[in-house]
C-alpha cells in the first residue's frame, strides 16, 4: 500500500474479521458482498491473489475493490456505499429460485448505515422472504467519524446501554440480532460466526461486531481519518486545500455561506471551515441525496451553501441536482472534486461522467479551472452568483497564473492566423 497507494486503515481493521469469515464459510461457493469494497485486501490475500498482491491498483494488476472478472471469490462489484444488502438479497433470492443452497453474507460498515439505500433494502427483507447474514462492522468511522442518530443507537449497543427498542429496530426488519462482539479477537469472533451460520438456515441474521480502524499500526490507530486512503508521495498541490482556505476566507465576510458534505470533511479539504464555523458546517454522513436537498432548502432561505463532493459520488444525487437545486434555480454551489480520470481506484471512482450528465441540466453553469489560482477566483465569483454553479476540478494541480474569470467566455491563451481552433476545458 505504501508503494501503490490504497485503503490502509480500513483494511487493517478487518484482518481478523476476514480470517473468521474465511474460516467459517466456504468461499467461493458461499457468496460475500463487501459494502463499498475498499476493505477487501485481506479477502484477496486469503483467496487466490496473494502472489499478485504486489500489483494492487496498477495497470494490469489486481483492483483495489472487488472485481468479478478478477476472481470467482468476488461475487459482486462495489465501490459506493450502501449497496451490499440489496446485492446480497438479490443473490439470495436467485439462489432460492434456482433451488440452490449456499450462504450469502453482506459485510457492511457502520458508516453505510447512514445511507438510505440500506434501509430500502432492509425494508424488502420480509417481502423477499429469503435469508442473508449481515455482518455490521462497527468502527465508528466512515472516512470521517460517523454521525447522527444511527451512530448514537450503535454506540449505545456497544456500550451495553442500548434499550430493547434498539435491538427491536433490527428485529422489526426480520433480522435476528447478535452482538456486540470484538471483531479483532478471533477467540470471541469464531464462536459467534459459527452460531450465526447455524441460525442462517432458518432466518436472516445481523452480527454486530466492533473493530478498530488501523488495528495493529499505531499511527493508523491514532489517525484513522488520515490513513483511510494512502497515496504515494506526489509533488502537486491539491485543490481541496485551496477549497478549505478560500471558503473559510469567504465565510469570514459573508454569514450566508455554509458548507455541506457527505462524510468526507477531511478528504475534501473542509476541516479549516468546520473548525472556524462549526455552526455553519454540516456533515450529514454518507447521504449524498439528502445533502443535496439540504443545500437546496438552505438556499431557499437566503443561505449560500457549498456542497463539496467527489464527482463519482455526485452521480448518486443526480435527481436532486436536477429537481431540487437547478429546477428551482437556487444559488447552491457544487464543488466537484476528483473530476476527470482519477487513476488507481478503478472504474468505480472515475470522475468522467459529470460533464456529460450536468451539461443538459437547466440553469446550471459549469466552470472548470485550469489551475488553482483560477479555482480560487471561481469560488469568489460563485459567492455572489444568483444561480447554481458547478465547479469541477481534479485532485492535483499547480497554483498557476491568474487569469480573469468571465462567465460564458473562454480565456484566449494563444492566437495566430491559422484556421484551427483548439478548445480546452480545464
Could you tell me what each predicted segment is?
Residues 50-66, 126-144, 282, 326-339:
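A glycine-rich helix N-cap at a beta->alpha junction
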Residues 36-41, 108-115, 136-142, 184-185, ...:
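Acidic, glycine-rich active-site loops and adjacent beta-strand->loop/helix elements
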Residues 1-47, 171-175, 180-190, 196, ...:
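N-terminal amphipathic, basic-rich helices that act as targeting or association modules
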Residues 19-23, 88-96, 132-134, 247, ...:
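Proline/glycine-anchored alpha-helix kink/cap motifs
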Residues 348-352:
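Flexible, small-/acidic-enriched active-site or ligand-binding loops
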Residues 74-236, 240-241, 245, 364-426:
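Glycine-rich ThDP/TPP pyrophosphate-binding loop and its adjacent helix/strand module
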Residues 31, 213-315, 320-330, 407-411, ...:
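Non-catalytic terminal/interface segments that mediate subunit docking, oligomerization
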Residues 7-128, 257, 261-262, 270-271:
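Cofactor-binding active-site loop characterized by glycine-rich and histidine/acidic residues
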Amino acid at each position: 500500500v505504501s508503494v501503490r497507494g490504497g485503503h490502509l486503515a480500513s483494511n487493517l481493521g478487518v484482518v481478523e474479521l476476514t480470517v473468521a469469515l474465511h474460516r467459517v464459510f466456504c468461499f467461493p461457493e458461499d457468496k460475500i458482498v463487501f459494502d463499498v469494497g475498499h476493505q477487501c485486501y485481506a479477502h484477496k490475500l486469503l483467496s487466490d491473489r496473494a502472489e499478485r498482491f504486489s500489483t494492487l491498483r496498477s495497470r494490469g494488476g489486481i483492483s483495489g475493490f472487488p472485481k468479478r472478472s478478477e476472481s470467482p471469490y468476488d461475487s459482486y462489484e462495489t465501490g459506493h456505499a450502501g449497496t451490499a444488502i440489496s446485492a446480497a438479497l438479490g443473490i439470495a433470492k436467485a439462489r432460492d429460485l434456482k433451488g440452490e443452497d449456499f450462504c450469502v453474507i453482506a459485510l457492511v460498515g457502520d458508516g453505510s448505515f447512514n445511507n438510505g439505500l440500506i434501509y430500502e433494502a432492509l425494508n424488502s427483507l420480509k417481502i423477499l422472504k429469503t435469508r442473508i447474514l449481515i455482518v455490521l462492522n462497527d468502527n465508528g468511522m466512515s472516512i470521517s467519524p460517523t454521525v447522527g442518530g444511527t451512530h448514537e443507537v450503535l454506540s449505545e449497543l456497544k456500550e451495553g446501554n442500548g434499550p430493547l427498542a434498539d435491538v427491536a429496530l433490527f428485529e422489526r426488519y426480520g433480522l435476528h440480532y447478535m452482538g456486540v462482539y470484538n471483531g479483532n479477537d478471533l477467540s470471541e469472533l469464531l464462536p459467534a460466526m459459527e452460531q450465526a451460520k447455524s441460525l442462517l438456515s432458518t432466518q436472516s441474521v445481523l452480527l454486530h461486531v466492533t473493530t478498530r480502524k488501523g488495528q495493529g499500526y499505531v499511527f493508523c490507530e491514532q489517525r484513522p481519518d488520515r490513513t483511510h486512503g494512502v497515496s504515494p508521495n506526489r509533488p502537486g498541490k491539491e485543490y481541496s486545500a485551496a477549497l478549505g482556505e478560500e471558503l473559510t476566507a469567504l465565510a469570514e465576510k459573508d454569514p450566508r455561506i455554509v458548507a455541506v458534505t457527505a462524510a468526507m470533511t477531511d478528504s475534501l479539504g473542509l476541516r479549516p471551515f468546520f473548525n472556524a464555523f462549526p455552526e455553519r458546517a454540516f456533515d450529514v454522513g454518507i447521504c449524498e441525496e439528502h445533502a443535496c436537498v439540504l443545500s437546496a432548502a438552505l438556499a431557499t432561505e437566503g443561505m449560500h451553501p457549498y456542497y463539496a463532493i467527489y464527482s463519482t459520488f455526485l452521480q448518486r444525487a443526480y435527481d436532486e441536482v436536477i429537481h431540487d437545486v437547478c429546477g428551482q434555480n437556487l444559488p447552491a454551489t457544487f464543488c466537484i472534486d476528483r473530476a476527470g480520470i482519477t487513476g488507481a481506484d478503478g472504474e468505480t471512482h472515475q470522475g468522467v461522467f459529470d460533464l456529460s450528465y450536468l451539461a443538459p441540466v437547466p440553469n446550471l453553469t459549469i466552470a472548470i479551472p485550469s489551475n488553482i489560482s483560477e479555482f480560487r477566483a471561481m469560488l469568489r465569483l460563485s459567492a455572489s452568483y444568483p444561480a447554481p454553479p458547478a465547479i469541477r476540478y481534479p485532485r492535483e494541480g499547480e497554483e498557476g497564473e491568474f487569469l480573469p474569470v468571465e462567465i460564458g467566455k473562454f480565456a484566449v491563451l494563444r492566437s495566430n492566423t491559422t484556421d484551427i481552433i483548439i478548445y480546452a476545458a480545464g
